């Protein structure tokens, strides 16, 4: 017969291919699929593969003008999720040709663009992505990475210390700069703009940049250490964001900051390129991540957002604290912390890692632990995150009864004590409290902090 067979057909005829052998160049995705009652899992998995690649709801004559076999996504494996009713992990392979080189934006538009609103699915969550080396090589990645950052800052063998300046909204630029100076002077490596400090009526960005630069230079002169403040360059337009980054470079400061999810991947990648070309480090905040990753059965796991950030570019990214959370959470968090830092990560389902990932020497990203932590947590943080991390104590610095500088001193003393104890072979997990107590005997600032936040 002439023509083609019109009409609606089952996706699984075309897009469910359990005998498919994945290629090294395929982008692989693991989706957690919750089909509507009565929808077989194979059909649901095939729908996801179709709608995120070449498929549409009915047969179209223009299908004959291309080779579907070459361009279609394929659902190649489905497994039920243990302990969950009617929930499956569907593995989908996408041919590399479907994606624009060096564009996280395009990768996400394809893989998670349309398919999450599908009627046949009750819920859908992207759990992990395997980025093939051929695609990774089209990205610049982090502007500098862990090693270059250490060399720029001349700080080795320990985690870095930071602090978010509070109250986050309402301070004038001069008072803000003063708070920055005191923290850096006391012994922190970095201070940080809050994610929502951009350029508001009470503190315009240029004034803040100037006073923070003054604080940095003064603290550097007094301590003999290199200091930084994450100047938030996030803005309403891409041009304005770059304008702020240019001004930071002209001031000679070491690092700027971006909210990569609210600012968007396109803006983030542009900023990362600018930062590499101009020697600026780039700190990334993940504001809005919980909108995407909080639900267990729908959205995207943070490890996917973390992988995307490593491709798009950033030298630091917030990654949760682990401390005081559930034990299982700890393994999962450490899984994506390794995905950020290491060059090669083996598949390990107990840590939430669905695919072996080879980053082909793309620079690593420093994970930032931030939120509700204080000096008593220092041994655990040092043990869990190791040297390649940034530990950020906002309230844990500024909440010190004697002020910011003593708060910074307390944190630095606690950190140095933990690192020294670890290097001497002591067990931080078991002896942590004892190590902090010993150190507080010769540091009144630490003793006062220990008293305020005793558990």
From Swiss-Prot:
GO cellular component entries: chloroplast
Q: Which residues form the active site?
A: 166, 285
Q: Which cofactor does it need?
A: Mg(2+)
Q: Does the keyword Plastid apply?
A: yes
UniProt catalytic activity: 2 (2R)-3-phosphoglycerate + 2 H(+) = D-ribulose 1,5-bisphosphate + CO2 + H2O; D-ribulose 1,5-bisphosphate + O2 = 2-phosphoglycolate + (2R)-3-phosphoglycerate + 2 H(+)
User: N6,N6,N6-trimethyllysine modification sites?
Assistant: 5
Free-text comment on the cofactor: Binds 1 Mg(2+) ion per subunit.
Keywords for this entry?
A: Calvin cycle, Carbon dioxide fixation, Chloroplast, Lyase, Magnesium, Metal-binding, Methylation, Monooxygenase, Oxidoreductase, Photorespiration, Photosynthesis, Plastid
- Provide the residue positions that the database annotates as binding substrate: 114, 164, 168, 286, 318, 370
Q: Which residues carry the post-translational modification N6-carboxylysine, per the record? A: 192
| GO biological-process terms attached to the record | photorespiration; reductive pentose-phosphate cycle
Compartments, record wording: Plastid, Chloroplast
Q: What InterPro entries does the entry give?
A: RuBisCO, RuBisCo_large_chain_AS, RuBisCO_lsu_C, RuBisCO_lsu_C_sf, RuBisCO_lsu_fd_N, RuBisCO_lsu_N_sf, RuBisCO_lsuI
Q: Where is the signal peptide?
A: none
Site note Transition state stabilizer, residues: 325
Residues the record lists as binding Mg(2+): 192, 194-195
Q: Cite the EC number.
A: 4.1.1.39
| Gene3D superfamilies xref list | Ribulose bisphosphate carboxylase, large subunit, C-terminal domain, RuBisCO large subunit, N-terminal domain
Query: Under the GO molecular function aspect, what terms does this record hold?
Result: magnesium ion binding; monooxygenase activity; ribulose-bisphosphate carboxylase activity
* Pfam families reported for this sequence: RuBisCO_large, RuBisCO_large_N
Role according to the record:
RuBisCO catalyzes two reactions: the carboxylation of D-ribulose 1,5-bisphosphate, the primary event in carbon dioxide fixation, as well as the oxidative fragmentation of the pentose substrate in the photorespiration process. Both reactions occur simultaneously and in competition at the same active site.
Oligomeric state and interaction partners are given as:
Heterohexadecamer of 8 large chains and 8 small chains.
Family, per entry:
Belongs to the RuBisCO large chain family. Type I subfamily.
Recorded hits in PANTHER family, A to Z, give: RIBULOSE BISPHOSPHATE CARBOXYLASE (PTHR42704), RIBULOSE BISPHOSPHATE CARBOXYLASE LARGE CHAIN (PTHR42704:SF15)
Q: What further fact does the record state?
A: The basic functional RuBisCO is composed of a large chain homodimer in a 'head-to-tail' conformation. In form I RuBisCO this homodimer is arranged in a barrel-like tetramer with the small subunits forming a tetrameric 'cap' on each end of the 'barrel'.
According to UniProt, the name of this protein is: Ribulose bisphosphate carboxylase large chain
Species annotation: Tamarindus indica (Tamarind)
Gene it is expressed from: rbcL
């Amino acid at each position: 017969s002439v023509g083609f067979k019109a009409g609606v057909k089952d996706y699984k005829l075309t897009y469910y291919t359990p005998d498919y052998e994945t290629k090294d160049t395929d982008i692989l995705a693991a989706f957690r699929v919750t089909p509507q009652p009565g929808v077989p899992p194979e059909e649901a998995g095939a729908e996801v593969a179709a709608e995120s690649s070449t498929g549409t709801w009915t047969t179209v004559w223009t299908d004959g003008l291309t080779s579907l076999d070459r361009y279609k996504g394929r659902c190649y494996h489905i497994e039920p999720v243990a302990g969950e009713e009617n929930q499956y992990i569907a593995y989908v392979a996408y041919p590399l040709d479907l994606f624009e080189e060096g564009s996280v934006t395009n990768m996400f538009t394809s893989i998670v663009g349309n398919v999450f609103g599908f009627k046949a699915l009750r819920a859908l969550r992207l759990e992990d992505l395997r980025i093939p080396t051929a695609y990774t090589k089209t990205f610049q990645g982090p502007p500098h990475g862990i090693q270059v950052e250490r060399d720029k800052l001349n700080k080795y063998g320990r985690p870095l210390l930071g602090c978010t300046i509070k109250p986050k909204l309402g301070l004038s630029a001069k008072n803000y700069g003063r708070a920055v100076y005191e923290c850096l002077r006391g012994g922190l490596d970095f201070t940080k703009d809050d994610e929502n400090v951009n350029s508001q009526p009470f503190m315009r960005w240029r004034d803040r940049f100037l006073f923070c630069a003054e604080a940095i230079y003064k603290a550097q002169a007094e301590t003999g250490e290199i200091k930084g403040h994450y100047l938030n360059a996030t803005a309403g337009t891409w041009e304005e964001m770059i304008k702020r980054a240019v001004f930071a470079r002209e001031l000679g400061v070491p690092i700027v900051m971006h909210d990569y999810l609210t600012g968007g991947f396109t803006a983030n990648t542009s900023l990362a390129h600018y930062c590499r070309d101009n020697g600026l480090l780039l700190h990334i905040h993940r504001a809005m991540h919980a909108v995407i990753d909080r639900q267990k059965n729908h959205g995207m796991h943070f490890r996917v957002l973390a992988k995307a950030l490593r491709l798009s570019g950033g030298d630091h990214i917030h990654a949760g604290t682990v401390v005081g959370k559930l034990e299982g959470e700890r393994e999962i968090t450490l899984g994506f912390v390794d995905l950020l830092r290491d060059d090669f990560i083996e598949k390990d389902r107990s840590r939430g890692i669905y695919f072996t990932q080879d980053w082909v020497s793309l620079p690593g990203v420093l994970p930032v632990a931030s939120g509700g932590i204080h000096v008593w947590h220092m041994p655990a943080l040092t043990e869990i995150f190791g040297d390649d991390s940034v530990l950020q104590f906002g309230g844990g610095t500024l909440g010190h009864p004697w002020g910011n500088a003593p708060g910074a001193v307390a944190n630095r003393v606690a950190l140095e004590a933990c690192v020294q104890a670890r290097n001497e072979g002591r067990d931080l997990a078991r002896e942590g409290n004892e190590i902090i107590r010993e150190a507080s005997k010769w540091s009144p600032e630490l003793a006062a902090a220990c008293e305020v936040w005793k558990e």
